Amino acid sequence: MSEYLLLLLPGAMYFWILFIGQTPLQEILQDKEQRILPRILACPVTLGQYVCAKMLRCFVLCSLAAALLIIVSALLFGIKWGPAPKLALVVVIWSVSMTGLTSLIQSLARTREQANVISPLVLMLFAMLGGSMFPYDNLPKFLQLLGQYTPNRWAVLTMLGVVHSKPMTEFIAPIAALLALGILGSLLAMVFFRRQLGAGQMK
């Protein structure tokens, strides 16, 4: 039972948490449309600090959700996730990547309506290709080729590396990919948000 769940849960967890974690970032577009943002920025808060605070909330929310799912699944189904220090490191890496990905998606949307269309499409596509909905090994070969470049697949590989007690060097590539996604995604999102929100403030 637990072995079967280990095939499905890591990818499914990453997918679910992405939807939970994007909530603080959705508030940015909401604050913009409801004209709350000018009042916030009237306080001693810069635009960069405001966006960073939303990203930090996203990171914390993703970390807590991942930790809770791991603990609950271990208690209910007896899943052995591996050494706690490595597991904590993977949770942090997951959360960094989720923050970068969701921030970038939200920053590319001009309105909440656009974000509500773009975000599910992108996240569902990654989920289908990366093994969050079906076991990755059961996918057709051409989909596996595409899926190996998705954050969902990288997340599964990092978690299974910890579960099977592999040396970190054996799954350093997906770790590096997730960290790169998190850092680059966050930096690009900051640039896009500053342009969009700064232009909106000038109107």
Predicted regions span which residues?
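Residue-level recognition of pore/gate-forming positions within transmembrane alpha-helices
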Residues: 58, 91, 120-124, 153-154, ...
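Short hydrophobic, aromatic-rich alpha-helical segments embedded in or entering the lipid bilayer
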Residues: 136-176
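Transmembrane helix-boundary elements of multi-pass transport/secretion proteins
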Residues: 1-42, 47-66, 79-84, 117, ...
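Hydrophobic alpha-helical transmembrane segments of polytopic membrane proteins
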Residues: 87-109, 127-130, 179-188
